[in-house]
Amino acid sequence: MQQALFGGGCFWCVEAVFLQIRGVEKVTSGYAGGHTTHPTYEQVCQGDTQHAEVVLIDFDEQQVTYSQLLDVFFATHDPTTLNRQGNDIGTQYRSVIYYFNEEQKQAAEHTIQTLKDDDLDIVTELSPTPTFYPAEDYHQNYYEKNPSQGYCNFAIPPKLLKLHSKFQHLMKN
């Protein structure tokens, strides 16, 4: 089992996307990249902790590769807006990839360079994996538990439509 750690805006949205991918065994919403130990959602939302909302993805590399997860990540959020995804503004919503090893770093660098070669101004941060703090229980599997919640109903379906149209071959049955 391998792990990936991505931040691409609200973790509810990112989690909802990656739970659809075959080979993804678990997605845990949480916080990483800041200076506060064991931050709360409220602290992260205030913007003082410097943590990003992230998802820790446990995946079977025999079913889905890290590079494929990177492709999904970049296609389902906007990696060209600094500290912002749609109406969500703040450093906690930054686009970030935390890598666990040199192979992940190289794969991310390659993907970012490919996007830059296509004239995209990528602002995604690439850093070694810091301490990951799981978010509170009510944030886990949030969209699955709250599909009609206003924010989820607005923000997540377009991401899932894009996922289904571009990555059908990676979807769970």
From Swiss-Prot:
It catalyses: L-methionyl-[protein] + [thioredoxin]-disulfide + H2O = L-methionyl-(S)-S-oxide-[protein] + [thioredoxin]-dithiol; [thioredoxin]-disulfide + L-methionine + H2O = L-methionine (S)-S-oxide + [thioredoxin]-dithiol. Pfam families: PMSR (PF01625). It is an enzyme of class 1 (oxidoreductase). Its EC number is 1.8.4.11. It comes from the Bacteria. The active site is at 10. GO terms for molecular function: L-methionine:thioredoxin-disulfide S-oxidoreductase activity; peptide-methionine (S)-S-oxide reductase activity. InterPro entries: Met_Sox_Rdtase_MsrA_dom, Met_Sox_Rdtase_MsrA_sf. Keywords: Oxidoreductase. This is Peptide methionine sulfoxide reductase MsrA. It comes from Acinetobacter baumannii (strain ATCC 17978 / DSM 105126 / CIP 53.77 / LMG 1025 / NCDC KC755 / 5377). The lineage of its organism: Bacteria, Pseudomonadati, Pseudomonadota, Gammaproteobacteria, Moraxellales.
